[in-house]
From Swiss-Prot:
GO terms, biological process: thiamine biosynthetic process; thiamine diphosphate biosynthetic process
Lineage: Bacteria, Pseudomonadati, Pseudomonadota, Gammaproteobacteria, Lysobacterales
Subunit structure: Homodimer.
Residues engaged in binding [4Fe-4S] cluster: C572, C575, C580
EC nos: 4.1.99.17
Protein name listed in UniProt: Phosphomethylpyrimidine synthase
GO molecular function: 4 iron, 4 sulfur cluster binding; carbon-carbon lyase activity; zinc ion binding
UniProt binding sites for substrate: N230, M259, Y288, H324, S344, R345, G346, D385, G386, L387, R388, E424, Y451
Gene responsible for this protein: thiC
Function: Catalyzes the synthesis of the hydroxymethylpyrimidine phosphate (HMP-P) moiety of thiamine from aminoimidazole ribotide (AIR) in a radical S-adenosyl-L-methionine (SAM)-dependent reaction.
Length: 614
């Protein structure tokens, strides 16, 4: 180990306190499953007692979904250079259908492993990859179609329910009926239902056998709406330590998956550090790295280079690949009259390759070969929308929908191989055209999970596209999209920093939750009900803690009312002590109750007769 490596490790170990401190007002809990090694992480928010003025009852803790891994647990010691514990290794090994390799299969991976110039940035804890035994298929879809409930399936069933069965307060369980547009929303998520949805292709459980550190999570329209956060270095910004911290930051605020879109130096090494320290599924766009291998010349790409890249990343543990196999040669001319042409990086790379060679997209012609790789490691397809609209003027055009139809064709091929598959979607779409996107995707792709970037509903707000897109995300999530890819305020302007990542995730957690409420997902309204009760009872700390971002809520409150005494006050700085609508409402209730008591006493004093002569 040289001095440079020591410096990098020291830098990587110094995750900032803002990233690792416990989330205020809550603690990490683990809900047991049917076996000792199945412990499902959640977060329990402690609530204070209702003030005597409002009844003085106890308020039970509220359990919520948690994506932060061990990083917010003060009982856990984090060692980034060792990586997270291999939670799922035993589950993978006990199935007996994989084998540990003696070394890396990818020629590029082997070259990187033995290059002494990379000692300073290489992840220090070497682990040998696993692969399916000859003739075996190790995907969760393959197991599900054979009627097997894996530990991963039980894990996500427990996780989705969020201990709903433990709630005894009927007020918290109150919920408006949802409109699910034909989705099969369940009152209780069972392992059997998880298995059946994966077998049908309506849900995916992205868990590469070489990412045993991951905590299983499910993506499907009949489950909680998930969100993805993008990170990654570029030629002009960010390094390995910054990307690891950005990962931990993203999952702290609620990223269900993270895509590493690195295009700068040390892509391979950066990804290894990220995967080994990630409790959530990691996705990539392999064509980005393949392009780096040919010095950025799209026309120089070959199937052999791309295939080696897929194997390299699969053996590192990438859980899902964006593959732009639907960008066909015949669709490229359809983009010529668009306002913004082809805006997808992957789409433009493949379009340029097709035109340079005047051949069909090699990702399309080699799709079954790709399926063979995917099922050997259980990598999930995220079929890329390389021809998505880059402005609302281009929405729902022939190029976009032609590609979507091809993605439906490819989905059927992937399912023939029992490879889990989700479909990527737009993009920029005005509100009135959003449902058409969802309906066509369900129809063309057999209800495979839809994974959309927004969509952005207007193009006039650079710097605020986390808002323009969250509007569309909430709508399309309600209509049936299973996962929403976040957009940050920096969209179209630059690479996001930490605050941008936080703002983007918060916008999308709001959108996803709004979609779950509208669909009528079981228990979706519990947190809203708990927070509303706390708000009416002026339990300020509980309001902060029940919010999606407790730190910001407290920060905003304390800007004008910073004293501890203000946490007990029956007003906020918006209205002050004399004009608080909730305080006035409580006074009205008190007057009404006093009036009823007075009338009751008058009734009894009059002989308690229902009818009296005047």
């Amino acid at each position: 180990m040289n001095a440079q490596l020591s410096a990098l490790q020291q830098q990587a170990q110094q995750l900032s306190a803002s990233v690792t401190r416990p989330i205020p007002g809550s603690r990490k809990i683990h809900v047991p499953g049917s076996r000792p090694d199945l412990q499902v992480p959640m977060r329990e928010i402690a609530l204070t007692r209702t003030p005597t003025l409002f009844g003085g009852e106890e308020n039970a803790p509220v359990t919520v979904y948690d994506t932060s891994g061990p990083y917010t647990d003060p009982e856990v010691r984090i060692d980034l250079s060792a990586g997270l514990p291999a939670l799922r290794r035993g589950w993978v090994e006990e199935r007996g259908d994989t084998e540990q390799l003696e070394g890396l299969s990818s020629s590029f991976g082997r070259d990187r492993e033995h290059d002494p110039k990379l000692d300073a940035v290489r992840f220090p804890a070497r682990s040998l990859p696993r692969r399916a035994r000859a003739g075996a298929n190790v995907t969760q879809m393959h197991y599900a179609r054979r009627g097997i409930i894996t530990p991963e399936m039980e894990f996500v069933a427990i996780r989705e329910n969020q201990r709903l069965d433990a709630i005894r307060d009927a007020g918290l369980l109150q919920q408006h009926p949802g409109e699910a547009f034909g989705a099969s929303i369940q009152k209780v998520i069972t392992p059997e239902f998880v298995r059946d949805e994966i077998a049908r292709g309506r849900a995916v459980l992205p868990n590469n056998i070489n990412h045993p550190e991951s905590e299983p999570m499910i993506i499907g329209r009949n489950f909680l709406t998930k969100i993805n956060a993008n990170i990654g270095n570029s030629a002009v910004s960010s390094g390995i330590a910054e990307e690891v911290e950005k990962l931990v930051w993203a999952i702290r605020w609620g990223g269900d998956t993270v895509m590493d879109l690195s295009t700068g130096k040390h892509i391979h090494e950066t990804r290894e550090w990220i995967i080994r320290n990630s409790p959530v599924a990691i996705g990539t766009v392999p064509i980005y790295q393949a392009l780096e291998k040919v010095d950025g010349r799209a026309e120089a790409l070959t199937w052999e280079i791309f295939r080696d890249t897929l194997i390299e990343q699969a053996e590192q543990g990438v859980d899902y690949f964006t593959i732009h196999a639907g960008v066909l040669l015949r669709y490229v001319p359809l983009t010529a009259k668009r306002v913004t042409g082809i805006v997808s990086r992957g789409g433009s790379i493949m379009a340029k390759w097709c035109l340079a060679h005047h051949k069909e997209n090699f990702l399309y012609t080699h799709f079954e070969d790709i399926c063979e790789i995917m099922k050997a490691y259980d990598v999930t397809f995220s079929l890329g929308d390389g021809l998505r609209p880059g402005c609302i003027a281009d929405a729902n055009d022939a190029a976009q929908f032609g590609e979507l139809e091809t993605l439906g064709e490819l989905t059927k091929i992937a399912w023939k191989h029992d490879v889990q598959t989700m479909i990527e979607g737009p993009g920029h779409v005005p509100m009135q055209l959003i449902k058409e996107n969802m309906d066509k995707q369900l129809r063309e792709c057999g209800e495979a999970p839809f994974y959309t970037l927004g969509p952005l509903t207007t193009d006039i707000a650079p710097g605020y596209d986390h808002i323009t897109s969250a509007i569309g995300a909430a709508m399309i999530g309600w209509f049936g999209t299973a996962m929403l890819c976040y957009v940050t305020p920096k969209e179209h302007l630059g690479l996001p920093n930490r605050q941008d990542v936080r703002d983007g995730i918060m916008a999308y957690r709001i959108a996803a939750h709004a979609a779950d409420l509208a669909k009528g997902h079981p228990g979706a309204q519990v947190r809203d009900n708990a927070l509303s009760k706390a708000r009416f009872e002026f339990r300020w700390e509980d309001q902060f803690h029940l919010g999606l971002d407790p730190e910001k809520a407290k920060e905003f409150h304390d800007e004008t009312l910073p004293k501890d005494a203000h946490k007990l006050a029956h007003f906020c700085s918006m209205c002050g002590p004399h004009f608080c609508s909730m305080k006035i409402t409580q006074d009205v209730r008190d007057y009404a109750e006093a009036g009823m008591k007075e009338k009751s006493q008058e009734f009894r004093a009059g002989g308690a007769e229902v009818y009296r002569q005047g």
